Amino acid sequence: MRGVAEAFAGAGYDVELPRLPGHGTAVSDMIPSRWSDWSFEVAAAYARLAARVDKVVVAGLSMGGSLTLWTALQQPSVSGIVCINPASQPQAEEMIEMVKGMLAEGTEVFPGIGSDIADPNVKESSYPETPLAPLVSMVEDGIKPMLSKYGSCKIPMLLITSKNDHVVDPATSDELAAQWGGPVERILLDRSFHVATQDYDKDFINESALAFAAKVTA
C-alpha cells in the first residue's frame, strides 16, 4: 500500500500507513499475531489521523481490505472506503477445520502465497511461509463477525477487483457488493493479479482512489 499512500500524500492529503503487528519483519513475528493486534493498530492509526483532519477515507488491500471494512463498521463517520481485492468472506468451513487440525498436530506454517503479480518485473516483498494461526484468527475473529453487519453500513465504497486473483476469489467481491448497505462503485482489473497496487494497474488504482476520495470528501 505504500504506493497508494504516497499518491495520496503527493496530492496533499494527510496520510497514516500503519505497519501491522507481525508484518514486514519475520515469519516468527507473525505467528503469534492475531486479528485483535492488527485491528488495534488500525484503530490507533485512525485515531491519529482523525485528530488532524475533518474527513477520513480508509483504504486497504487483501487483509488490509478486511480491516478497512472493520474500520467502516466501527467508525460511521468515515467518508468513504477503498477496498482492493479484500478478504471479505470466510473460507470454506472444511478448509478452516483442516487448518485447525494442522495446528493441533504442531504445524505452524505452510508455503506462502505472496507475490501474486502479473508483471514479471515486479516481486512483492512477502514472507515465504503463511502462518496458520493468524489465518484462522482473520477468518473467525475478523471476517465472520462482520458478515451480518455489512448491510447496515451506509458508507460509500470503491471496490476494486482483479479478475485474475489467485489469492482471494474475485467472486467474493460480488458477494460483498451485494451485501454492502451503502453505495458501491466497482472497478474490474483485467491485467493485474492479487497484489494489484504493485502490478500493471497500480497507477490507475491510485488515480481512481484519489478521484473517489475527492468525491466523498467534497
Which sequence ranges carry the predicted segments?
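Short alpha-helix in the alpha/beta-hydrolase fold that links the catalytic acid
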Residues: 4, 155, 169-178
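Catalytic nucleophile-loop/oxyanion-hole region of alpha/beta-hydrolase
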Residues: 26-52, 57
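Active-site nucleophile loop of the alpha/beta-hydrolase fold
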Residues: 82-92
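Catalytic active-site module of serine/aspartate enzymes centered on a nucleophile-bearing elbow/loop
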Residues: 191-218
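Short beta-strand/loop motif that positions the catalytic acidic residue
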Residues: 153, 159-161, 165
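Catalytic histidine neighborhood in serine/cysteine hydrolases
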Residues: 14-17, 174, 178-195
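Gly/Ala-rich beta-loop-alpha elbow adjacent to hydrolase catalytic centers
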Residues: 60-64, 68
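Short, surface-exposed "cap/lid" segments of acyl-processing enzymes
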Residues: 1-26
